[in-house]
Amino acid sequence: RLADHHRLFDGLRVNVITNEQIYNEFSSGSPDPAAIRDFARLLYQRPAAGNKLRYLLLFGDGSYDFKDRVPFNTNKVLTFQTKESLNTVYSYASDDFYGILDANEGNDAVGLIDIGIGRFPVNTAEEAKMAVDKCIFYATNSSLNMGDWRNKLCFVADNGNSNTHFRQVEKQICPLIENIAPVYNLDKIYIDAYKPVSTPSGQKCPDANAGITSNVQNGVLLINYTGHGGETGWAEEGILTISEIKSWTNYKNMPVFMTATCEFSRYDDPDPARVSAGEHVFLNPQGGGIALFTTTRLANAGTNIGLTLYFYDTLFSKSNGEYPRFGDVISYAKNRMGGFDASLVRNFVLLGDPALRLAYPKYNVVTTHINGKPINQEMDTIPAMQAVELKGIVTDGSQHALTNFDGELDIKVFDKVRTLSTLGSLPGDYPDKYTLQDNFVYQGRATVTDGEFTVQFMVPRDIDYSYGPGKISYYAHNDVMDANGFSKKLMIGGSGNESTDNVGPEISLFLNDEKFVNGATVGDMPLLVAHLSDVSGINTIGNSIGHDIVATLDGDNTTSVVLNSYYSANLDSYQSGVVNFKMPQLPEGKHTLTLKVWDVFNNSSETTIS
């Protein structure tokens, strides 16, 4: 099925070959990794460029036990293992061996990689079907999987080591992304930015765990982790665990993972009961990740950062008008490492389909006017409490308007970049500054007709009044195609005219659906549904002033939950929208639920149901 998908969807020539066919032809019927490489080299050496091998998918788990001496072995598709078996750095499994195909290369996996290689670490027919289903669903645009999660990247950094991991992400990786792919919105989860919590099992950072889970569940295109890790998760604080991975239900918005850490995805243990955290990410049938660029053994921080920078430079660069496939990304990035110790690069593998691409939006969204002024004129300044009108178009790669594009536009207008600081909680670490652009001026939805759109909103009173550039972020889609774009031609700051609005929002609060009545019986995890409206707009800016959408259970403020991110504006309206939030598990008995909401001029309302 996966081969048929690539034939029909991508126009690729695809062959499906069994282990036995290869062994019979190239190693007298005996299992041998060299046989797989020889077969790949045969296809690679074909003279016609259109027939030359480009991608190799190893469809099955691997094991360091080639000869099946261990009972219940996971030896489905052979792995290449180093001669070294005692040194934990220089002993590793690698699939690169199968792709080093030029003459006089390949001995001990030395040389440049000529094809893109990935692996599905599957052991059963059920796992295999699940992996194929996920890939086809991810690659096929539909109303089910398109969304502005495709505009978001998340970067996670460990603490310790004198801020090494933090500095690699904040000072090197993120600036690169902001330079080569500024259309994407960055979230940052730095362990040292959160106050540690002491527990019987050591220091934990539950806010970091919650941030990672929120990104996965709500949708993010890619998650990058830099720091210490292992087969059971990330960081000494356990900011990502196997139990958390298995609980993810994000099938409609599966991210790619880049993990510059140690043996997070060791797949070659022969014990089928010993499944690494990275494998669980890929094998989660309810979501998890669509692919991982990840490690099978110990890794080195110095090599990790070099490979990571090349990875992103390749991932977000077009060649002949097209973005690379996953196999291209990992092979090009490794080859660009050049003089680095090969063993510290070879242990990075692709768990996923090498012929798949990241879910890049295909087309562009462009702002044409702000408050009636063409965007190419002097940057407009938008103060608090002022009405704003944006106009724009959807374009193709040549910047020609797509007049046949009808769909919806998701828009986020960000306030200025803010500067925060880490805490320096561990010995050897120190407080260090980092930037984040995460406060919203407006979030909404608009109709796109014949490739054109208009958005109107009111700037909240709660913005940062200093002057600086904001960011407009767009994501447009219909049932078959999508587009994204951004603009920083928007100066935000200062104060406009005082408002005469002194009336708070209207709130209609329900559990599960609009048929709910006070006193009704519900399950232990009901859905909070709140319809909100206000003539000036709902405040979801979330800048810590306290004017958030907040739900409180039984009048206990310790249970309060901020619901700004669960608010969705109604189509073509900044004055109304709905909150949908799955409540945490409730104990049996009677309860009350209070919802407090503010408008953009800081008038509040609240309502309570029981």
Stretches with model-predicted labels:
Residues P383-E389, T521-L528:
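Short coil/turn motif common to extracellular beta-sandwich-like domains
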Residues G470-Y474, P505, P526-A530, G577, ...:
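Short, well-structured beta-strand segments within conserved domains
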Residues G392-L402, E514-V517, H531-I541:
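Short amphipathic, basic-aromatic surface patches that mediate peripheral association
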Residues R1-R445, T449-M458, S466-G468, A476, ...:
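Cysteine-dependent hydrolase recognition
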Residues T454-P460, V578-P584:
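Exposed aromatic-hydrophobic patches
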Residues H400-D410, L420-G424, V535-G555:
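Solvent-exposed loop/turn segments flanking beta-strands in beta-repeat/beta-sandwich domains
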Residues I370-N376, S508-F516:
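Short, solvent-exposed loop/edge segments of extracellular or virion-exposed proteins
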Residues A359, L490-P505, F510-N512, I609-S610:
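Flexible, low-complexity linkers/stalks enriched in Thr/Pro that connect modular domains
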